[in-house]
């Protein structure tokens, strides 16, 4: 759900580089002044120190990527549990239908058997009402033949009905057994998904504790390397007879990133933001809480979808309110003629949340909400939560995971994206998602410590395709 912190709005070939962490190139530009190019030993020393700083920054960036991957694994686990539980509920419904069909088949057999027994007993006790031998006229003979044919046809019909009822019972019992197997498997899958989500939450908490310590260690290494680099630069500058202020920015570990402002001391923006381990004691409670919110969100989406279709004057009695395009189809419930209107409504809905804080796992169809872990105490949105909320206004139901959102809708080459399309970042859209506004701008819930905002589109790390949920 979160974007890769390495990003650049410059050009597609650029790498993601966290703005707050100075790159090797930026340090080199500060160091390689004309006055420093004459002393080869000093230049070699400075080059080595630049490499040390770059390596330290890269290790911090790698750790930041690991944190993002851990958060995404939890978000995906939640979606998997929701899907598995939905499948289990559907399988239980199918099982109930099959069981009712078996009961109906048994009742049909009992009725057919009763009719057959009654007919057989009557035939045995009474025999033909009139025999050929006792017929006294041609009319009586004809009546006897007709009665015999009718009796035979009736007997065959009763037996056929009984056989058909027995065949239907065999089929319904077979279907019921299959439905039971599917229901059992779906229930087992749901349990396995829940166990996986609990394990992901627990493992994430453990890793965050370790990564928090690792950040401090790597930060100390980075600061030490930066201090050595600065000392070497000062020596080189002094050896060239430098006077006045040095021709490069002096680095102070307490002053914030180069060229930036000092921070408030709560966290260092040049370091990866490790979520606090404030997951409640029972991870199952977290899973159930998140899925409860998700179920409510689905109902809210359906209600808003019906309301939107009603406003357009195209609501049908059979409409569920969910307007997503069905699998394999590019056209959803919203006709193309109303597509632009729907897309603008989505954008207005999303833009209304500008300034709302980022909250990992936060956001649903009804609005901002408390998330999980670092987002547990913050009412807000993460990236996919904001997209989910925006499109819910027109009845488009989306999962709360950017990787799953990427697999819905119609994929369009990113070079052809238009206002209202959805932009994804990372492998298979698994790291970040935004809404394209046009003119090179996008709406996003960016990262921990930031707020929903409009920002320039970043091409680095963007998937080859954007996704179009609304056609027009």
Curated annotation (Swiss-Prot):
It comes from the Bacteria. Exported by the Tat system. The position of the signal peptide cleavage has not been experimentally proven. It is an enzyme of class 3 (hydrolase). Changing residue 383 to A: Loss of enzyme activity. Keywords: Cell wall biogenesis/degradation, Hydrolase, Protease, Secreted, Signal, Thiol protease. InterPro entries: NLP_P60_dom, Papain-like_cys_pep_sf, PG_Endopeptidase_C40, RipA. It is found in: Secreted. Residues 340-472 form the NlpC/P60 domain. It comes from Mycobacterium tuberculosis (strain ATCC 25618 / H37Rv). Was identified as a high-confidence drug target. One of its GO terms (cellular component) is extracellular region. The gene is ripA. GO terms for molecular function: cysteine-type peptidase activity; N-acetylmuramoyl-L-alanine amidase activity. Peptidoglycan endopeptidase that cleaves the bond between D-glutamate and meso-diaminopimelate. Binds and degrades high-molecular weight peptidoglycan from a number of Actinobacteria; activity is increased in the presence of RpfB and inhibited by PBP1A (ponA1). Required for normal separation of daughter cells after cell division and for cell wall integrity. Required for host cell invasion and intracellular survival in host macrophages. This is Peptidoglycan endopeptidase RipA. Belongs to the peptidase C40 family. Optimum pH is between 5 and 5.5. MoxR1-mediated folding is critical for secretion via the TAT system. The synergistic effects on peptidoglycan degradation of RipA plus RpfB are inhibited by addition of PBP1A (ponA1). Its EC number is 3.4.-.-. Disulfide bonds: none annotated. Monomer. Interacts with RpfB and PBP1A (ponA1) via residues 448-472 of RipA, interacts with RpfE. Interacts with the chaperone MoxR1. RipA-MoxR1 interaction in the cytoplasm leads to proper folding of RipA, resulting in its secretion. Also interacts with Mce2B. Residues 1-39 form the signal peptide. GO terms for biological process: cell wall organization; cell wall organization or biogenesis; proteolysis. The active site is at residues 383, 432, 444.
């Amino acid at each position: 759900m979160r974007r890769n912190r390495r990003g650049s709005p410059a050009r597609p070939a650029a790498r993601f580089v966290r703005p707050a962490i100075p790159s090797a190139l930026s340090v080199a530009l500060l160091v390689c002044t004309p006055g420093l190019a004459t002393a080869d030993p000093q230049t070699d020393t400075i080059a080595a120190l630049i490499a040390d700083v770059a390596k330290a920054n890269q290790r911090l960036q790698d750790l930041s990527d690991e944190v993002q991957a851990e958060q995404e694994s939890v978000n995906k686990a939640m979606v998997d549990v929701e899907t598995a539980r939905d499948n289990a509920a559907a399988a239980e419904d199918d099982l109930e239908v099959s069981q009712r069909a078996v009961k109906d088949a048994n009742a049909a057999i009992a009725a057919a058997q009763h009719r057959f027994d009654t007919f057989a007993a009557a035939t045995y006790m009474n025999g033909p009402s009139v025999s050929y031998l006792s017929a006294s006229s041609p009319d009586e003979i004809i009546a006897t033949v007709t009665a015999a044919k009718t009796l035979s046809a009736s007997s065959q019909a009763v037996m056929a009905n009984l056989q058909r009822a027995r065949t239907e019972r065999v089929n319904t019992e077979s279907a019921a057994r299959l439905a039971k197997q599917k229901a059992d498997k779906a229930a087992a899958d749901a349990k396995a998904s829940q166990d996986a989500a609990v394990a992901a939450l627990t493992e994430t908490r453990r890793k965050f504790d370790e990564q928090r310590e690792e950040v401090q260690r790597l930060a100390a290494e980075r600061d030490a390397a930066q201090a050595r680099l600065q000392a070497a630069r000062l020596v080189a500058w002094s050896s060239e007879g430098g006077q006045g202020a040095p021709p490069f920015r002096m680095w102070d570990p307490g002053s914030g990133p180069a060229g930036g402002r000092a921070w408030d001391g709560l966290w260092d923006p040049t370091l990866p933001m490790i979520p606090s381990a404030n997951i409640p004691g029972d991870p199952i409670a977290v899973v159930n809480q998140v899925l409860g919110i998700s179920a409510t969100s689905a109902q809210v989406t359906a209600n808003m979808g019906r309301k939107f279709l009603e406003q357009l004057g195209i609501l049908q009695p059979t409409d569920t309110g969910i307007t997503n395009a069905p699998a394999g189809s590019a056209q959803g419930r919203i006709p193309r003629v109303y597509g632009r209107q729907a897309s603008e409504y989505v954008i207005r809905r999303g833009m209304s949340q500008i300034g709302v804080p980022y909250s990992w796992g936060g956001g649903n169809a009804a609005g901002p909400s408390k998330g999980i872990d670092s987002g547990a105490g913050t009412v807000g949105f993460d990236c996919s939560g904001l997209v989910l909320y925006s499109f819910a206004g027109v009845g488009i139901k989306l999962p709360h995971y950017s990787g799953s959102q990427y697999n819905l809708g119609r994929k369009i080459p990113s070079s052809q994206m238009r206002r209202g399309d959805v932009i994804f970042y990372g492998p298979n859209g698994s790291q970040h998602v935004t809404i394209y506004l046009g003119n090179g701008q996008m709406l996003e819930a960016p990262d921990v410590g930031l707020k929903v905002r409009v920002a320039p589109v970043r091409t680095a790390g963007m998937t080859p395709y954007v996704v179009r949920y609304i056609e027009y």
